[in-house]
UniProtKB/Swiss-Prot annotation:
Keywords tagged on the record: Periplasm, Signal, Transport
Function: Part of the ABC transporter complex GsiABCD involved in glutathione import. Binds glutathione.
Subunit structure: The complex is composed of two ATP-binding proteins (GsiA), two transmembrane proteins (GsiC and GsiD) and a solute-binding protein (GsiB).
InterPro entries, alphabetized: Peptide/Ni-bd (IPR030678), SBP_5 (IPR039424), SBP_5_dom (IPR000914)
Protein name: Glutathione-binding protein GsiB
Chain segments annotated as coiled-coil in the UniProt record: none
Compartment annotation: Periplasm
Length: 512
């Protein structure tokens, strides 16, 4: 039964008020303050990293990613791939139970992948699984997955946070409402979900990893106000908070009871330019705008130093990423290129943003000022999620109003395909996926497709390098920065950290 708990947040002088009717803290109850709300507890139907991160309380996949974004076994013990790259045979961990008592086995894997790969279910993460032709039960501890075409990053897809193993009994019982009734093999099970306020999970006594979990419960609490989220740590109302607003970082670092952590990420921030529209169809214009942005200054102004200038179109910690010399800040060169392109007096355009939080606003204002110095007048619009879905993600090339678009991308598979194909492949123009530059290059398309058909690391490296070299030269983006992830936690909380894709890792979390 869902409990309903109400309270009113108050914040004054940087201190959060105490919370009325807040759930009583257990001996090892951890409160995690996060920056936005959750959309669903069904990982297959969530487009946001936060919902998938919280779902890791209940769910696990066959594989996962460690804090260095390397694939690790979780519910799988190993796998083999056929010579033609089409068939994956996976050996499963035995003796694992779902939280409703059902057995985890090959039939459970089949039920989940059949659901995920069926377009009739209209799941938001269908694109990850559309290459699955069939999933077969070999025996209770072995499953065989056949693909429609070779896809060498398939194990990374199975390691993606979306690929969770849900109890088949729960899928049958709850159907489309499974997002409200999570049942997995994870260390915690749902206790309460107040959809406007918090998700509370409690220790699953039947968890298969001996000695875990160490916490009694975790309360995931959305707190959209930056100051309130930081203040909850100061007052002890939360033991972990993310993201920490950059302007609050120095203050929290001085608190002897807290630890501030700036960790590496795979979150790249960039501005795409619609290369099918004037003036962005001209390569010299795109080069000019890249020369116009002082990325070192942007790091200081918008990110308080918690970012690094982008050195490519794929963050360095992603497999097969290529690094280049960052674009130098040279407004004189930018003006010269605009003149050569036929725009001696600059031009007017629009700059949209996929987010409207304070950091995005700072990036937009900084970029607007930088562009103005070379004669480019940009009218800025910071969008909410609904506007973004309708105006950017939902419209094709002919009807799209996108010209310049500030956004970010986190390739949660840890592999170059998911960092490149959704953003640069010709087939992935909106509304299919997120190629908001409407970029198209036949050689890039060929390289990306070929890289998925080979299991030879050297050949994959060559293909991904060639694709990135072309993209970097043709400049459909203004690559800006790779963010650092700033979190803070009570010093008596251990084993709880932020993953490079902005998800959470808390398998070994403990409260001393």
């Amino acid at each position: 039964m869902t409990q309903f708990i109400t309270h009113k947040w108050l914040a004054a002088l940087g201190l959060a008020s105490s919370i009325a009717a807040f759930p009583a803290l257990a001996a090892k109850d951890v409160v995690v303050a996060v920056g936005s709300n959750f959309t669903t507890l069904d990982p297959y139907d969530a487009n946001d990293t936060l919902s998938q991160a919280v779902a890791k309380s209940f769910y696990q996949g066959l594989f996962g990613l460690d804090k260095d974004m390397k694939v690790k076994n979780v519910l799988a013990e190993g796998y083999t791939v056929s010579d033609d790259g089409l068939t994956y045979t996976i050996t499963l961990r035995q003796g694992v139970k779902f939280q409703d008592g059902a057995d985890f086995n090959a039939a459970a894997v089949k039920a989940n992948l059949d659901r995920a790969s069926n377009p009739d279910n209209h799941l938001k993460r269908y694109n990850l699984y559309k290459n699955i032709a069939k999933t077969e039960v070999v025996d209770p501890a072995t499953v065989k997955i056949t693909l429609k075409q070779p896809f060498s990053a398939f194990i990374n897809i199975l390691a993606h946070p979306a690929t969770a193993m849900i109890s088949p009994q729960a899928l049958e019982k709850y159907g489309k409402d499974i997002g409200f009734h999570p049942v997995g093999t994870g260390p915690y099970q749902l206790e309460t979900w107040n959809q406007t306020d918090f998700v509370k999970v409690k220790k699953f006594a039947g968890y298969w990893q001996q000695g875990l979990p160490k916490l009694d419960s975790i309360t995931w609490r959305p707190v959209t106000d930056n100051n309130t989220r930081a203040a909850m740590l100061q007052t002890g109302e939360a033991q972990f908070a993310f993201p920490i607003p950059y302007e609050q970082a120095a203050l929290l670092a001085k608190n002897k009871n807290l630890e501030l952590v700036a960790s590496p990420s795979i979150m790249q921030r960039y501005i795409s330019m619609n290369v099918t529209q004037k003036p962005f169809d001209n390569p010299k214009v795109r080069e000019a705008l890249n020369y116009a942005i002082n990325r070192q200054a942007l790091v200081k102004v918008a990110f308080a130093g918690y970012a690094t200038p982008a050195t490519g179109v794929v963050p360095p910690s992603i497999a097969y990423a290529q690094s280049y010399q960052p674009w130098p800040y040279d407004p004189a060169k930018a003006r010269e290129l605009l003149k050569e392109a036929g725009y001696p007096d600059g031009f007017s355009t629009t700059l949209w943003s996929s987010h409207n939080h304070s950091t995005a606003q700072k990036v937009l204002q900084f970029t607007q000022q930088q562009l103005a110095q070379i004669g480019v007048k940009a009218r800025i619009t910071a969008m909410d999620a609904g506007q973004r879905a309708a105006e950017v993600e939902g419209k094709g090339q002919k009807e799209s109003g996108v010209r310049m678009f500030y956004t970010g991308w986190s390739a949660s598979t840890g592999e170059a395909d998911w960092a490149l194909s959704p953003l640069f492949a010709s087939q992935n123009w909106p509304p299919t996926q997120f190629n908001t530059a409407f970029y198209s290059n036949k050689q890039v398309d060929s390289d990306l497709a070929a890289a998925l058909k080979t299991n030879d690391p050297q050949e994959k490296t060559r293909l991904y390098k060639e694709a990135q070299d072309i993209i970097w030269k043709e400049s459909p983006w203004i690559p800006l920065v790779v963010e650092k992830l700033v979190s803070a936690h009570s010093k008596n909380l251990t084993g709880f950290w932020i993953m490079p894709d902005t998800g959470f890792s808390f398998d070994d979390a403990d409260l001393k």
